[in-house]
């Protein structure tokens, strides 16, 4: 057996390969791309926005029941990229952790603490042989009472961080470089600019002109810190504004 091959080292989640890699955890990152979707999150001056594709895999499905945006608390929302069942399980756990925090401490959990908690749980999944990492990536948005708008992302390895803008899924690399260029030029976007930057990023990297039914947009703003999902009419207004500008 050559030392470079992954033979034997990807059987167990808890064994390092001779190169110091955990193959099962790396495979979990590949699983995020299985759904074929890309999600983008952008933080503005007084808002945070998440945008993801909405693909209905089957003609007979009721499209109103297909979603990748979830409300965790009144004021924290998330977009899940990756395997749908794993995503729902992680969202359920996040809701439990948020409710638990509220019960224990008497106030809503901040976005960064929720992300840290989910990352801690994911990290344990990379240590124990009887568990497997979840094949999904969670991007959280919310308004922090002290810090203002927040975007946090947590991955199957248990790594988490706050972002000005970030992406996950199939076109993550392309989206990230697009967002880096945008953020370098300007960063204190208004609400409209933030939503439109996120939508432009997604449509540019996928080379698609979206119809309102093909994307989902979730927002939180300082004026209205409750997480809400935009209606198709609202998304259409943003798409029209973008088209007129082009």
Swiss-Prot record:
<feature type="modified residue" description="Phosphotyrosine">
    <location>
        <position position="159"/>
    </location>
</feature>
<dbReference type="GO" id="GO:0051603">
    <property type="term" value="P:proteolysis involved in protein catabolic process"/>
</dbReference>
<dbReference type="GO" id="GO:0005839">
    <property type="term" value="C:proteasome core complex"/>
</dbReference>
<dbReference type="GO" id="GO:0016363">
    <property type="term" value="C:nuclear matrix"/>
</dbReference>
<comment type="function">
    <text>Component of the 20S core proteasome complex involved in the proteolytic degradation of most intracellular proteins. This complex plays numerous essential roles within the cell by associating with different regulatory particles. Associated with two 19S regulatory particles, forms the 26S proteasome and thus participates in the ATP-dependent degradation of ubiquitinated proteins.</text>
</comment>
<keyword id="KW-0597">Phosphoprotein</keyword>
<dbReference type="GO" id="GO:0030016">
    <property type="term" value="C:myofibril"/>
</dbReference>
<dbReference type="GO" id="GO:0003723">
    <property type="term" value="F:RNA binding"/>
</dbReference>
<dbReference type="Pfam" id="PF10584">
    <property type="entry name" value="Proteasome_A_N"/>
</dbReference>
<feature type="modified residue" description="Phosphoserine">
    <location>
        <position position="63"/>
    </location>
</feature>
<dbReference type="InterPro" id="IPR034642">
    <property type="entry name" value="Proteasome_subunit_alpha6"/>
</dbReference>
<dbReference type="GO" id="GO:0006511">
    <property type="term" value="P:ubiquitin-dependent protein catabolic process"/>
</dbReference>
<dbReference type="GO" id="GO:0007519">
    <property type="term" value="P:skeletal muscle tissue development"/>
</dbReference>
<dbReference type="GO" id="GO:0005929">
    <property type="term" value="C:cilium"/>
</dbReference>
<feature type="modified residue" description="N6-acetyllysine">
    <location>
        <position position="104"/>
    </location>
</feature>
<comment type="subunit">
    <text>The 26S proteasome consists of a 20S proteasome core and two 19S regulatory subunits. The 20S proteasome core is a barrel-shaped complex made of 28 subunits that are arranged in four stacked rings. The two outer rings are each formed by seven alpha subunits, and the two inner rings are formed by seven beta subunits. The proteolytic activity is exerted by three beta-subunits PSMB5, PSMB6 and PSMB7. Interacts with ALKBH4.</text>
</comment>
<dbReference type="InterPro" id="IPR001353">
    <property type="entry name" value="Proteasome_sua/b"/>
</dbReference>
<dbReference type="InterPro" id="IPR029055">
    <property type="entry name" value="Ntn_hydrolases_N"/>
</dbReference>
<dbReference type="GO" id="GO:0019773">
    <property type="term" value="C:proteasome core complex, alpha-subunit complex"/>
</dbReference>
<dbReference type="GO" id="GO:0005739">
    <property type="term" value="C:mitochondrion"/>
</dbReference>
<comment type="similarity">
    <text>Belongs to the peptidase T1A family.</text>
</comment>
<feature type="modified residue" description="Phosphoserine">
    <location>
        <position position="17"/>
    </location>
</feature>
<feature type="modified residue" description="N6-acetyllysine">
    <location>
        <position position="102"/>
    </location>
</feature>
<dbReference type="GO" id="GO:0005654">
    <property type="term" value="C:nucleoplasm"/>
</dbReference>
<dbReference type="GO" id="GO:0030017">
    <property type="term" value="C:sarcomere"/>
</dbReference>
<dbReference type="GO" id="GO:0005829">
    <property type="term" value="C:cytosol"/>
</dbReference>
<dbReference type="GO" id="GO:0043123">
    <property type="term" value="P:positive regulation of canonical NF-kappaB signal transduction"/>
</dbReference>
<dbReference type="InterPro" id="IPR050115">
    <property type="entry name" value="Proteasome_alpha"/>
</dbReference>
<keyword id="KW-0007">Acetylation</keyword>
<keyword id="KW-0963">Cytoplasm</keyword>
<keyword id="KW-0325">Glycoprotein</keyword>
<dbReference type="GO" id="GO:0051059">
    <property type="term" value="F:NF-kappaB binding"/>
</dbReference>
<dbReference type="Pfam" id="PF00227">
    <property type="entry name" value="Proteasome"/>
</dbReference>
<dbReference type="InterPro" id="IPR023332">
    <property type="entry name" value="Proteasome_alpha-type"/>
</dbReference>
<keyword id="KW-0539">Nucleus</keyword>
<protein>
    <recommendedName>
        <fullName>Proteasome subunit alpha type-6</fullName>
    </recommendedName>
</protein>
<feature type="modified residue" description="Phosphoserine">
    <location>
        <position position="64"/>
    </location>
</feature>
<dbReference type="GO" id="GO:0005737">
    <property type="term" value="C:cytoplasm"/>
</dbReference>
<dbReference type="InterPro" id="IPR000426">
    <property type="entry name" value="Proteasome_asu_N"/>
</dbReference>
<feature type="glycosylation site" description="O-linked (GlcNAc) serine">
    <location>
        <position position="5"/>
    </location>
</feature>
<dbReference type="GO" id="GO:0000932">
    <property type="term" value="C:P-body"/>
</dbReference>
<dbReference type="GO" id="GO:0005840">
    <property type="term" value="C:ribosome"/>
</dbReference>
């Amino acid at each position: 057996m050559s030392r470079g091959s992954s033979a034997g080292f990807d059987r167990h989640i808890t064994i390092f390969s001779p190169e110091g890699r955990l193959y099962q955890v790396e495979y979990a990152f590949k699983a995020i791309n299985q759904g074929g979707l890309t999600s983008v999150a952008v933080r503005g001056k007084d808002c945070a926005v998440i945008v993801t594709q909405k693909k209905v895999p089957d003609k007979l499905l009721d499209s109103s029941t297909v979603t990748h945006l979830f409300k965790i608390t009144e004021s924290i929302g998330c977009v899940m990229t990756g395997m749908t069942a794993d995503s729902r399980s992680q969202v359920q756990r996040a809701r439990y952790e948020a409710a638990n925090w509220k019960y224990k401490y008497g106030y809503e959990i901040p976005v960064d603490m929720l992300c840290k908690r989910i990352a801690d749980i994911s990290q344990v999944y990379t240590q124990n042989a009887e568990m497997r990492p979840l094949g999904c990536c969670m991007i959280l948005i919310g308004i922090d009472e002290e810090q203002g708008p927040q975007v946090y992302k947590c991955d199957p390895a248990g790594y988490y961080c706050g972002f000005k803008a970030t992406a996950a899924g199939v076109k993550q690399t392309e989206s990230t470089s697009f967002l880096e260029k945008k953020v370098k030029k300007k960063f204190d976007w208004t609400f409209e600019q933030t939503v439109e930057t996120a939508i432009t990023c997604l449509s540019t990297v996928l080379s698609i002109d979206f119809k309102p039914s093909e994307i989902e947009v979730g927002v939180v703003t300082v004026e209205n810190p409750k997480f809400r999902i935009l209606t198709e009419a609202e998304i259409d207004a943003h798409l029209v504004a973008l088209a007129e500008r082009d």
